[in-house]
Amino acid sequence: MATNLKDIADQYAKAIFELSSEQGNVEDTRKDLDTLKVVFENNPNFVTIVSSNDINSEARDGLLTTLTTGASEAIQNLVKLLAYNNRLNLLTQIVTSFEDYYNDAHGIVNVVATTAVALDETRLDKLAAVFASKTGAKHVNLTNNVDESIIGGVILQSQSTLIDGSLQTKIAKMKAQLLG
């Protein structure tokens, strides 16, 4: 049984991912969820308004129907279920967990490349290719984070892998060897 909100969100995400996989509409579900996430992020008071006791159920249902117009029946039902269980506040976490399931199923890995200076697209593409070859990922989404304190080199980090080729780490290791 789920004990924390992240676990609860993960259960919803897994259920909607499995359902959309069975129905063959994972891409549509993903787009619908991304759209909802944007709405929730751009309107932080939406959950408070919809969950308020000051709003009657007819108005609440109308807002939720308007929100999910054009979305699949599964997404419409998910939003209604979340509202019924007072869990609309979990929607953005559900979308994040859904993306994790989607990425795992498609061999997609999100990686942060930390460098001392910003890298151009050519270098980022080369780093993505190197990371993919070392980890077996089918596709790598690489973002560049600039941190001058690493001095030089690169640190590649995904959810499960860390490759530290920074000069800062190399210098620290040399220092430890010399002093140790």
Curated annotation (Swiss-Prot):
Subcellular location: Cell membrane
UniProt keyword annotations, A-Z: ATP synthesis, Cell membrane, CF(1), Hydrogen ion transport, Ion transport, Membrane, Transport
Membrane topology: Peripheral membrane protein
Lineage: superkingdom: Bacteria
Listed GO MF terms: proton-transporting ATP synthase activity, rotational mechanism
Quaternary structure note: F-type ATPases have 2 components, F(1) - the catalytic core - and F(0) - the membrane proton channel. F(1) has five subunits: alpha(3), beta(3), gamma(1), delta(1), epsilon(1). F(0) has three main subunits: a(1), b(2) and c(10-14). The alpha and beta chains form an alternating ring which encloses part of the gamma chain. F(1) is attached to F(0) by a central stalk formed by the gamma and epsilon chains, while a peripheral stalk is formed by the delta and b chains.
Function: F(1)F(0) ATP synthase produces ATP from ADP in the presence of a proton or sodium gradient. F-type ATPases consist of two structural domains, F(1) containing the extramembraneous catalytic core and F(0) containing the membrane proton channel, linked together by a central stalk and a peripheral stalk. During catalysis, ATP synthesis in the catalytic domain of F(1) is coupled via a rotary mechanism of the central stalk subunits to proton translocation.
Family the UniProt entry places it in: Belongs to the ATPase delta chain family.
PANTHER family according to UniProt: ATP SYNTHASE DELTA CHAIN (PTHR11910)
Protein name per Swiss-Prot or TrEMBL: ATP synthase subunit delta
